[in-house]
Amino acid sequence: MLAKTWLEHARGVMERIEATQLEAVGRAAEIMADSIAAERWVHTFGCGHATIPVEEMYPRIGGFVGFHPMIELPLTYFTHITGEMGIHQFLFLERAEGFGREVMKSYEFDPRDTMWIFSHSGLNPVNIDVALEAKARGLPLVVTGSAAAYRDEPARHSSGMKLFELADVVVDTCVPAVDASVPLADHVDNVGPVSTIAFTAAVWMVITTVAERLVERGVRLFIHPSHNLPGDTTARERLDAALREYKRRVAGV
């Protein structure tokens, strides 16, 4: 049964992340905790399915104020498949050098901020544009993706750089370059990608560690509560408080 094959591959990725990435998780968390303790931002960016970890972390039950999602609709909303905002346009834009620079012009950054970028391959120019602009503004850069699998691939950006080479900290998702992990008889291509579950695991490993570091420093966290629990009469108040805090902090971005 191929369901078990996929689960075995997913478990293998989780085990590799645990075995090899805890030190990187800790270093990334320390950088992010510095930003959030200063009431600054961890800006999060990705394109394609690498926007899923951005959307997973905030706003979300169990997430907390301090993470600022930079979601570009043409880079994430391509589920029409064809027609307007289709896959052809998306594939063009993620490889269009210069587009990421234009994205960055729409925000105000501070050197106390952190940039966190997600990319499976680290090759597409839009991510490298964003990374280069973040570094030029003095932001530390954390990158999460399949760094080891793409170490020997040539760069696509005119700078000659790949995303993982620009990072101050890389959290490797430990996913093979061929993301889809389950082969099928009589087919060239596999099914069953594992990068999304690896991204999600990396996100919560880092964020729970950020929370741990902030609590150790005495920083109050504005956490989004589980707001559908029977008997919890203050969840909506706590949610409203978190949203007010987000609104206050994001005003200058």
Segments and roles (model prediction):
Residues 20-37, 103:
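A short, well-structured juxtamembrane/interface segment
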Residues 1-20:
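Generic N-terminal amphipathic, Lys/Arg-enriched alpha-helix
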Residues 229-253:
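Acidic, Ser/Thr-rich low-complexity intrinsically disordered segments
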Residues 2, 24, 194, 198:
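Conserved acidic
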